[in-house]
């Protein structure tokens, strides 16, 4: 299972991730990396994706997937991918651009930058990162960086997980992804968590945090085992 971090201005480091350990305890190799766009490797590395989401970051992630696919303990024909927030964005971007993964779970994702501009609590800072303005000023640029534009070609079974009180990536982002996948004829499900914010995986109600993990594992088991 390829795990992609959120942010994108965050990074993976030497700390305990209960989610990774949970999947590993159920028989999966969990692998992760820090692509361009995140922190920890200098300003040039961090700003490499500004104005080009889905460009250098996607390239780095695919190179890492290539590397892992050559490992003797990895079955390259049974690879899954998941992530939340920016990691959810990249998960949808990946399944819209390659069919190499056999299963995907996109969590609290960005799906459409155009509609999100008017509904998210951080559209003001995103304009800075995207080097864009409003949709009226930068429609083509925002649309071209939106995963939903490319979901019509995907073949990857994809589970959508979203939280109904998410103000960062509003629920309509998950709804758009689900509808696009259904129209493409892809195997998909939409899991909605009521009352939960963007940070369900960290601060959500305990039973719902457990349910989220079980939904991811269920989906991966269905297509990878």
Regions found by a protein language model. Give the residues of each.
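Active-site-proximal cap/loop segments of hydrolase catalytic domains
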Residues: 3, 10, 17-20, 24-25, ...
């Amino acid at each position: 299972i390829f795990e992609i971090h959120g942010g994108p201005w965050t990074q993976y480091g030497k700390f305990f991730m209960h989610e990774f350990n949970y999947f590993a305890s159920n028989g999966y190799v969990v692998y992760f990396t820090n692509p361009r766009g995140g922190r920890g490797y200098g300003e040039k590395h961090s700003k490499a994706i500004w104005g080009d989401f889905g460009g250098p970051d996607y390239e780095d992630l695919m190179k890492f997937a290539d590397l892992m696919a050559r490992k003797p303990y990895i079955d390259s024909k049974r690879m899954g991918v998941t992530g939340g927030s920016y990691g959810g964005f990249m998960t949808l971007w990946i399944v819209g651009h390659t069919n190499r993964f056999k299963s995907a779970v996109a969590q609290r994702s960005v799906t459409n930058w155009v509609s999100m501009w008017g509904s998210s609590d951080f559209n003001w800072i995103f304009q800075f990162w995207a080097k864009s303005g409003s949709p009226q000023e930068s429609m083509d640029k925002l649309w071209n960086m939106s995963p939903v534009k490319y979901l019509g070609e995907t073949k990857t079974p994809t589970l959508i997980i979203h939280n109904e009180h998410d103000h960062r990536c509003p629920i309509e982002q998950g709804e758009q992804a689900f509808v696009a996948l259904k129209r493409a004829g892809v195997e998909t499900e939409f899991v909605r968590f009521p009352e939960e914010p963007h940070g369900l995986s960290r601060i959500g109600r305990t039973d719902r945090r457990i349910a989220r993990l079980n939904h991811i594992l269920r989906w991966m088991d269905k297509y990878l085992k």
